[in-house]
Amino acid sequence: MILTTTEGQKNLPRYFSQVFKMLQRMESGRLDIALPDGRVFRNEGAKPGPVARVDIHDPDVFARLIREGELGFSDAYLEGGWSTPDLRAFMDLVHLGTETVYDDFTGKFLVQAYERLRFWLHRNNRKQAKKNISYHYDLGNDFYSLWLDETMTYSSALFETGQESLEKAQTAKYASLVDEMGAKPGDHILEIGCGWGGFAEYAAKERDLRVTGLTISQEQLKYATQRIEKAGLSDKVTFKLQDYRDERGQYDGIASIEMFEAVGQKYWPVYFQTVRDRLKPGARATLQIITVADRRWDVYKNGVDFIQKYIFPGGMLPAPTVLRQEIQQAGLDVVKSKEFGPSYDLTLRRWYDTFNDKWDQVAAMGFDERFRRMWNYYLTACGAAFDTGNCDVTQITVAKPN
């Protein structure tokens, strides 16, 4: 029997009635909540949408949602307090519309203040930036190579049809960056945040560019250097284990692929001033950046979400309007931008499928079920944010005035 109201129901988990009442504001989709005693409660919006089910294993989940907001609920998932047969469907439902279900559950002030303090302590000065990057990217090259495509690219691909391979779509993204930047054969370009060297290899091999790539991840530097040596491109590509703020000289162009998100809001002016200083007069930089919708900016900037706590400590996304303001304040001109959020949704879904297909091999490296739940939560939450338009990804091209 499916229940649609808590009226007359006894022995409900603490705060469940309050949570269920708030969920009745859902406009689209359907959510079933199965309690430990077998009772199933259903909320259904008037409009069609994702259909999801949540199985509650720890009755304290609802108290944590009220007390701690989104982070409390996500923490409970990592700890096995609740589960769902289709995490992607649940995330699609949660992020549907102009707001998220979590907006009604902001958490208590002291909990919010504590998480903001933790986030502040992870701000990206030079020392902390290296720690923050290592936290994520130094999980191991073998780990990432299991579920990324052959290019070892950990950023959004650019799909044309959605049917092509991830490798082909990643190469299309690289091509777009060079095209938008306007780099010509023989030019010397700077890549701020070179990852595992995929873009640098493409730029040198396919577009005859010289590339200087910067990273503060020891693991990435090792992999990228070996990759370029194997490709016979060491005369064209140089990698440095160096903070972007310490680079000197000027370049014919700059590429930066989803590195800005790790900079931290305090250092956005420094980042764009560095871009300006490193460009030759009249030269362009094309920056691939994840953005949070303008309508979500106030809620987002004043909180700490799951991604900031567990995946990218110290990270912060800009809103499109804020991003353009920062660029202009640095004395750079916005030339154009290309948005392709649906491609990121598809990229994340491909990663999710491959990660889970390869889970036995990932587990053999020492990663446990809690890590699996964390990674799946991260991939599906991000995918849903792009699918619903709460987040987008842009290749924004800026120029240094002559």
What are these regions (language model features)?
Residues 282-290:
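Conserved beta-strand signature within the Rossmann-like core of class I S-adenosyl-L-methionine
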Residues 269-281:
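A short glycine-rich, Lys/Arg-flanked "PGG" loop and its adjoining helix->strand segment in the class I
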Residues 245-254:
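A short acidic, Gly/Pro-enriched loop at the edge of an enzyme's catalytic core
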Residues 290-402:
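Substrate-binding/catalytic lobe of Class I Rossmann-like enzymes that use SAM or dcSAM, i.e.
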Residues 1-164, 168-170, 176, 183:
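Feature captures hydrophobic
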Residues 185-193:
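Conserved class I S-adenosyl-L-methionine
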Residues 224-225:
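Conserved SAM-binding loop
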Residues 196-207:
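Conserved SAM-binding loop of SAM-dependent methyltransferases across substrates and taxa
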